[in-house]
Amino acid sequence: MPRFKKGRDLNHWKTNRPDSDVGKLRIVGGVYGGRQIGYSGDPVTRPMKDDIREAVFNLVGGWTPGKIVFDLFAGTGAMGLEAISRGATKCFFVERHFPTVKIIRENVQTLDPDMNASVDASDSFFWCRKFLKDPASWPTEPWLVFFCPPYGLYVKSKDELLELIEKFKDAAPDESLIVVESDKRLDVSSLPDHESWEVRTYSPAVVSIFKKF
């Protein structure tokens, strides 16, 4: 069985930072910590809340430096930007919603015009299939892969998502991490090699983490 743990009360992670402004999110740690990034406010992007993102990076942050990041179904791009802030060397952002892609590109330019980032306006399923078919293009450094799709896809496209997660798990180099954000509609025991995942609940979010050794 997956290792279930209730996420620590989010009040534990809260500091005296004011809440993010409407239309803004905040990088919570690393070299860009405290800086705001743009957010359209469109619920289609459903960004992970600052406090949940902080809790997640308290779990994986020590593994982040030197990683190649894949922020799939990127939405606001906050996960990838947070990872870059905490020492990841490059991020591939993949998001199909064109207005949001524009905001991700603006956020990259605002934080660091020289950031090592690739922002692709593409369907994540299509992009991943193309990427996975070309092993010569795979980075050899360990990966940090974020799967944070709209929760409804775990119902509408469950099998396709699980297949994609499994393929990334198999393709990733040793020392890689995979982070899957879902809600309770995903039975985490259906994740590939499900006994190896650590699962935390930050209601309504369920965060599952796989470390490849």
Where are these regions (language model features)?
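Class I S-adenosyl-L-methionine-dependent methyltransferase catalytic core
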Residues: 1-213
